Every structure is written in structure tokens, then in C-alpha cells.
Amino acid sequence: MVADLNRCVGCQTCTAACKHTNATPPGVQWRKVLDVEMGEYPNVERLFMPVGCQHCSDPPCMEVCPSTATGQRKDGIVTIDYDICIGCSYCAVACPYQARYKVETPRFAYGEQPTETEALRFDEGRIGVAQKCTFCSDRVDAGLARGLKPGVDPDATPACANACIANALTFGDLEDPDSNVSKLLTDNTWFRMHEELGTEPGFFYLWNEK
């Protein structure tokens, strides 16, 4: 995924779309937007930075998982098998991006009972185990099965990218040189979070420093 920080307006529509799609409980944001100050006075700039699981090529969360619940697909998406996860939270400690959550008891937006929308998407298997952004892998897989192209067809693209009003989030195949994400990285200046850690994130940021 590529986030264009030159375009992001900090509206957090991506956060809302993610919460609606995945029915994450209060306090859990698989996709959130940071309000960041860059530079030093008087040359200060403000930017908004979408963050979440970086779907690293060398994920430290997977390395420390004692139950092998954390895995990685061939397309690079880092996954969690809720049936195998023992809830030790080693992965949450190892993640340098603070992208993992653990919810011990069911929580809902308005009281003890879920709303109609929450009830449709509530997954009891996520209680007491690690959870995080999945890049809407179920949606991606369903789209691929129908011959759709992730990052091009909305029904094969993560909810956050579909919802972005500024077209700041772009999803696609990094191994395809003709994909939308590959072209963005070729034509623009980009960086990744905590490159120095060697995790090789699959989430890229475009930023033209003024």
C-alpha cells in the first residue's frame, strides 16, 4: 500500500471505513491517522500520516510468536490465525509500529449490546487474542476469485483505500511493475517507517518536502 502524505487531509474517513468494515471495538483502530509536525520553528509543516500494520517482509511479530499464529501469505500480507493464537502478546511487544491490539472482553460502541451493524460483523474469535489490520484480505481474496484486480476494482480493494476522499491511499501489487503502486513509487520520492530496523515494511509513504 502507498499513502500519499501530500494528499492526505486528516479526515480519518479511512479509520471510519475500517471500523465499519471490521467492527473493531472502541479504542481499537486498525487504521488510524497521526497528526505530525515536521521541521523546526519557524520552518514547520503539518502532515497527516495513516498508520497501521506495515505488513513487513521480515515481520518481527512473526519471529517471536510461540504458537506460529502469525504468518505471512505469498502476497506479503501478514496474518493472524485466531484459532492458534494463545494471547501472549509477544507480537504486540515486538511490533515497532504499535499496530497490534488485544481485547479481553467484548466491547461495543453504545453499551453492552452490539448495534445491528456490529452484530453482523462481530467476530468472537478475536476476543483474548492478537488482532490487527488484515488489508481486508477476505475482500481481496473474494475479489480475486471473481477475476477482479486489487487496487483497481473496489470489491477487491481494502475498505480504507476505497473510502479515502483525497485518493491518498493506493493498494496494489508491488511485484507488478505496471501496477498503480509500482508506478507511484517509481515517479515519486518515498520512505518507509523505521527503515533502520530492517523490517522491510510493505507500506510506503510519498512525501515531497517543501
Question: Where are these predicted regions, by residue range?
Answer:
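Non-ligating segments of multi-cofactor redox enzymes
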Residues: 1-210
